[in-house]
């Protein structure tokens, strides 16, 4: 069973594609320097420039790129610096 991944908050997709390290990945800008990154998807179902709503499906968990097993690498960045996601949940 493929597990879906979802946008953590509303925003605009700025990257939806392939990276050698992140595999199939999605990057969403939420404004004010806040960005979320979702890595290692088996497939993605959004495209760059697309607006997404909080909770909208963006892809499926996978093990692409530098990965040893199926998982979602979720990262929050503020002005380009990784920050604790718990501060935004």
Enumerate the predicted regions with their spans.
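Catalytic cores of peptidoglycan-degrading enzymes
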Residues: 1-89
């Amino acid at each position: 069973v493929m597990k879906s991944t979802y946008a953590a908050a509303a925003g605009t997709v700025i990257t939806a594609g392939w990276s050698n390290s992140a595999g199939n990945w999605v990057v969403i800008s939420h404004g004010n320097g806040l960005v979320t990154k979702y890595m290692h998807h088996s497939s993605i179902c959004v495209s760059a420039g697309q607006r997404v709503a909080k909770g909208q499906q963006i892809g499926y968990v996978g093990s692409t790129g530098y990965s040893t097993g199926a998982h979602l690498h979720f990262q929050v960045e503020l002005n380009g610096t990784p920050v604790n996601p718990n501060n935004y949940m």
